[in-house]
């Protein structure tokens, strides 16, 4: 949300510096960016009042204007359609430097236009670089009538804009009033409401409509106003909108937009000729039907979608956008003005069905203030009456009522336990009261806290504690640790740090899956009982579905590769009991690395994902002797490119190449390699692993290569580990050199080549010693290979 500093200052009892505002936003968790429009780029442009206009004797479309700057008069030839006496405009004197529409600089000089001398130029907003200040049409920029004469025009127009990046939980800040409320609390200044937003109540008629659905819209108001038109907004209103960098459209639309941006309450305008106000209400669509919207887009509204309608037809998609047929237009003279409080979940459901976005929907989905529905409507009505004095306002129709605010119980002991700071009962009471909560003391160290209607993010006791910490973080001086040390948390943190530093991106996916995503991993699913949405009905029992969906999204948006991991909770069923476990998922797809002149193109393979697991194990000092790799038969993986990983004979996880049909189902064209490990089991093993210092060898090593012909079912790594398990003083390492498999489909054997490294750390081994040790190991291995009918070539 982008607003000007000057508009924000109007809500404070005393002015705040830009530094104070930025620091306050940092404390309450709102990101800010500053954009300053400087007046130094223009010179010799002052404010002047047109005191007389005369027709140009030699040109029908030009006038000769006389302007007064408070000290002297200036004669200027002007062709603007709104050049008339008694308005204050920007006057560029000779020597002033401006820019044309293409950005090219030029200098104002004294000149003659059709034989009449012109001592400068009257300027429009676009010529000053402030085109956002007025509607896009040729004409002079008009200052308010009380603007001082002879002042720098650019200095009066220049302002500082602040871009506020709001997180979804801060919907109550999506307005000038909301932002000012938060900043005022942190900076300890009083919040004031400008005069244009403070009005006395108007006549109300409370109605009862059996068709109105309060589960969508608990509070609905509308009013008929006669005698208006779609004329150009006065400069004052255009300038007010410009403080949000909003373009002017027409008077009525500008008023509703300004009220929404300033107070956070969206309003909607209907043409009264097309809408029956007596039957106007909100309901769920009874059947699927089409609707042409304000943006000329035709949509199909599914059954059950929240709509606004009268007894004749649908007039809008509730909380999102109105219909084009009932919209305010150039011929409208009578309007119906609507203000309502829609439940956020109802509008979110509509946007799920129809992916439309609007400023109104942005606010309704995050939650608006039901207490501001009528005040915002009053403000809009009075603004309309100010611009259209002859307009007639009928009584306001009201359906439903304002829902009560939730009341929570807060224990002082809870605050101290979470924050780690000793706080008295009165301190907690005072802090919450200053935040706008209604606090009532209770017995036994607890408080009854009524949440303000605009705070949709406060629903539980812990939210109140978080709010205290968020708004006054500098008061929280840690006197003691708020929680005990968690080995699992520290271990997870180390895994994240290692994998992220090694080049993998961390993904975060939702624990709850929709049916389509869950089906990527399993066919039979258990659905949760209390479903908040049809898009979140299944608890995941693996990280695979979420990671696979995220991978598809990134690759389909032209990402060259996805090398990512996720550390999260999965939910499994064992002996009819559900349990939560921590799981680590690693997924690779696309290119192996970014192409450059240094690296040749390399493709990912089964061994790429295996390599990542080995790097992780080395980081935690888990020896290869402690884990084994065995063939597996999981349906999600390629039948011949998958394996189970066992650690101390306990299943740790599995890895491999995902099944091509699964990749096709997920709309991924590249092979996908995936691994998933139990973090709980990994932590248990890591506790036993000890890093031991190994001095660098000073004596040379020797090696011997052997080739084993074994049954194709024998894992090559099993041979390597078998050799390492034999008692030997000098066998330092065994590595796999190559594996050869006969292309003949009837062949049952394969050749595995191994390299045995021998070394004595205290002296150089003789060739005879190495040969004797080598022969001894081969003899032992021959005995082990009897069952496999393998042979050995050394």
Swiss-Prot record:
Residue span(s) of domain tRNA-binding: 39-154
A GO BP annotation: phenylalanyl-tRNA aminoacylation
Any one Gene Ontology cellular component term annotated for this protein: phenylalanine-tRNA ligase complex
Catalytic activity reported: tRNA(Phe) + L-phenylalanine + ATP = L-phenylalanyl-tRNA(Phe) + AMP + diphosphate + H(+)
Pfam family, one: B5
S-S pairs: none
Protein origin, superkingdom: Bacteria
Protein transport in keyword set: no
Enzyme class: ligase
Residues annotated as domain B5: 403-481
Main localization (coarse): cytoplasm
UniProt keyword Magnesium, yes or no: yes
Matches recorded under HAMAP family: Phe_tRNA_synth_beta1
Family label: Belongs to the phenylalanyl-tRNA synthetase beta subunit family. Type 1 subfamily.
Protein name in UniProt: Phenylalanine--tRNA ligase beta subunit
Gene: pheT
């Amino acid at each position: 949300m982008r607003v000007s500093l000057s508009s924000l200052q109007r809500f404070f009892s005393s002015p705040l510096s830009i530094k104070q505002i930025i620091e306050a936003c940092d404390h309450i968790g709102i990101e800010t960016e500053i954009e300053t429009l400087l007046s130094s780029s223009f010179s010799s442009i002052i404010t002047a009042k047109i005191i007389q206009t005369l027709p140009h004797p030699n040109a029908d479309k030009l006038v000769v204007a006389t302007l007064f700057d408070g000290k002297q008069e200036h004669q200027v030839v002007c062709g603007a359609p709104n050049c008339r006496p008694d308005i204050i405009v920007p006057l560029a004197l000779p020597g002033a430097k401006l820019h044309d529409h293409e950005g090219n600089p030029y200098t104002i000089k004294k000149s003659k236009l059709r034989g009449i001398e012109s001592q400068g130029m009257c300027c429009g907003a676009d010529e000053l670089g402030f085109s956002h200040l007025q509607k896009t049409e040729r004409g002079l920029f008009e200052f308010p009538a009380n603007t001082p004469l002879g002042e720098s025009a650019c200095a009066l127009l220049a302002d500082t804009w602040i871009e506020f990046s709001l997180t979804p939980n801060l919907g109550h800040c999506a307005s000038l009033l909301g932002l000012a409320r938060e900043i005022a609390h942190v900076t300890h200044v009083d919040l004031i409401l400008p005069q244009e937003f403070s009005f006395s109540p108007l006549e109300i008629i409370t109605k009862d409509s059996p068709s109105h659905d309060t589960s969508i819209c608990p509070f609905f108001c509308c009013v008929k106003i006669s005698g208006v038109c779609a004329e150009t907004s006065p400069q004052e209103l255009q300038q007010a909108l410009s403080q949000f960098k909003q373009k002017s459209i027409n008077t009525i639309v500008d008023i509703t937009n300004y009220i929404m941006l300033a107070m956070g309450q969206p309003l909607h305008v209907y043409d009264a000729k097309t809408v029956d106000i007596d039957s106007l209400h909100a309901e769920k669509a009874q059947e699927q039907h089409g609707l042409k919207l304000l943006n000329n887009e035709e949509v199909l509204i599914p059954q059950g979608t929240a709509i606004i309608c009268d007894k004749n037809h649908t007039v809008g998609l509730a909380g999102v956008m109105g219909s084009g047929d009932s919209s305010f237009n150039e011929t409208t003279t009578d309007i119906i003005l609507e203000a309502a409080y829609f439940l956020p979940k109802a509008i979110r459901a509509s946007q799920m069905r129809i992916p439309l976005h609007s400023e109104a929907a942005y606010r309704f989905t995050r939650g608006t203030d039901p207490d501001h529905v009528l005040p915002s409507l009053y403000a809009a009505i009075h603004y309309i009456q100010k611009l259209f004095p002859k307009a007639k306002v009928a009584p306001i129709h009201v359906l439903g009522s304002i829902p009560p605010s939730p009341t929570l119980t807060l224990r002082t002991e809870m605050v101290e336990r979470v924050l780690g700071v000793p706080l008295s009962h009165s301190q907690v009471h005072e802090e919450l009261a200053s935040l706008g909560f209604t606090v009532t003391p209770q017995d036994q160290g607890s408080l009854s806290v009524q949440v303000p209607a605009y705070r949709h993010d406060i629903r539980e006791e812990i939210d109140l504690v978080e709010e205290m910490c968020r708004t006054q973080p500098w008061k929280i001086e840690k006197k003691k640790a708020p929680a005990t040390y968690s080995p699992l948390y520290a271990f997870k943190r180390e895994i994240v740090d290692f994998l992220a530093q090694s080049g993998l991106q961390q993904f975060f996916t939702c624990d709850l899956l929709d049916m389509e995503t869950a089906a990527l991993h399993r066919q039979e699913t258990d659905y949760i009982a209390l479903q908040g949405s049809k898009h979140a009905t299944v608890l995941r029992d693996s990280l695979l579905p979420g990671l696979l969906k995220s991978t598809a999204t990134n690759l389909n948006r032209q990402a060259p590769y996805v090398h990512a991991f996720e550390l999260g909770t999965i939910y499994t069923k064992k002996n009819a009991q559900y349990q939560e476990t921590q799981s680590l998922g690693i997924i690779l797809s696309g290119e192996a690395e970014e192409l450059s002149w240094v690296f040749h193109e390399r493709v990912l393979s089964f061994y790429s994902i295996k390599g990542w697991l080995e790097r992780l194990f080395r980081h935690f000092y888990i020896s290869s002797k402690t884990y084994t790799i065995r063939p597996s038969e999981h349906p999600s993986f390629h039948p011949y490119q998958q394996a189970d990983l066992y650690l101390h004979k306990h299943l740790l996880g599995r890895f491999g190449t995902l099944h091509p049909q699964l990749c096709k189902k997920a709309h991924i064209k590249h092979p996908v390699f995936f691994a998933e490990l139990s973090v709980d089991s990994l932590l248990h093993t890591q506790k036993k692993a000890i890093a031991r210092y190994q001095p660098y060898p000073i004596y040379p090593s020797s090696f011997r290569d052997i080739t084993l012909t074994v049954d194709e079912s024998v894992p090559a790594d099993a041979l390597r580990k078998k050799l390492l398990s034999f008692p030997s003083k000098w066998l330092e390492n065994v590595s796999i050199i190559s594996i050869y498999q006969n292309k003949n489909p009837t062949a049952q054997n394969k050749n595995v080549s191994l390299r045995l490294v021998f070394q004595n750390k205290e002296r150089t081994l003789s060739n005879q010693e190495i040969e004797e040790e080598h022969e001894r190991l081969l003899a032992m291995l021959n005995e082990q290979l009897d069952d496999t009918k393998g042979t050995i070539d050394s």
